[in-house]
């Protein structure tokens, strides 16, 4: 059995809707194999929502104008295609827009139903004069990739229903590059960097997760031909190994104050793993272990990327700390670790 070092994936957040994902180390050649597959999947196969057709009051086709509206229907459709929407519905849903001039018509004027959200409300759709009035229905559907207005046209659709081009993909841009990285004495391993930029309807990490799920499903078809076939097995995760080492660490290595240390030892807490299994409420039940001790422990654990277990619902740490014996001398003066 061939065992390779398990790659790790880290995310560098550039802004709310752009991230760089680094996957390393990869066996030589796998950087381009994985990078190309991820890029194509991200650009073409991430589900999303878009407007598929509109119906404007008083309009029969797109090659006309609306009284009191500066933009003609063609320009109106071009603006509508820039709408960023998300929908929880598998079936088509309708949004409504009604606006009386004068003034601008923006995406914020659209009234979406429950389960549908417009993510760029500042988008300008049209300009109305003093006598202008715009009433419109916008049909939203879920899908993948790009679908033209011709494909969106339905047989026997009602008169005045105008199909529009639909860009379902929530991903705007994907680039990747492969660099060399070192593993022990070898310098020919691959480091894959994938830069993902999305619309406001989806975070880059969610798009990346969706692409990964799709690829796993597809490559699983080949695996099912012979589930016992030999391949390259990934070794243990370095993150898991580091976490395991932290959890077995004795609490002596946290370098707590004498009071906190002795309180924990009296309670039978000897390792970091036993400590993180306790909640703040559990620790405040320990005699002489109060708010200052809690803050000290939380700070030490945070430095390791760890934290205490969640307290029960309704737990009030402030009230609990006030009732604790923190820093009350009460004859409790210990100066040795034991």
From Swiss-Prot:
Its EC number is 2.7.7.6. GO terms for cellular component: cytoplasm; DNA-directed RNA polymerase complex. Keywords: DNA-directed RNA polymerase, Nucleotidyltransferase, Transcription, Transferase. Residues 1-226 are annotated as: Alpha N-terminal domain (alpha-NTD). It holds the Pfam family RNA_pol_L. Residues 243-338 are annotated as: Alpha C-terminal domain (alpha-CTD). It comes from the Bacteria. It catalyses: RNA(n) + a ribonucleoside 5'-triphosphate = RNA(n+1) + diphosphate. One of its GO terms (biological process) is DNA-templated transcription. DNA-dependent RNA polymerase catalyzes the transcription of DNA into RNA using the four ribonucleoside triphosphates as substrates. The N-terminal domain is essential for RNAP assembly and basal transcription, whereas the C-terminal domain is involved in interaction with transcriptional regulators and with upstream promoter elements. Belongs to the RNA polymerase alpha chain family. Homodimer. The RNAP catalytic core consists of 2 alpha, 1 beta, 1 beta' and 1 omega subunit. When a sigma factor is associated with the core the holoenzyme is formed, which can initiate transcription. NCBIfam families: PRK05182.1-2 (NF003513), PRK05182.1-4 (NF003514), PRK05182.2-5 (NF003519), rpoA (TIGR02027). This is DNA-directed RNA polymerase subunit alpha. It comes from Streptomyces avermitilis (strain ATCC 31267 / DSM 46492 / JCM 5070 / NBRC 14893 / NCIMB 12804 / NRRL 8165 / MA-4680). The lineage of its organism: Bacteria, Bacillati, Actinomycetota, Actinomycetes, Kitasatosporales.
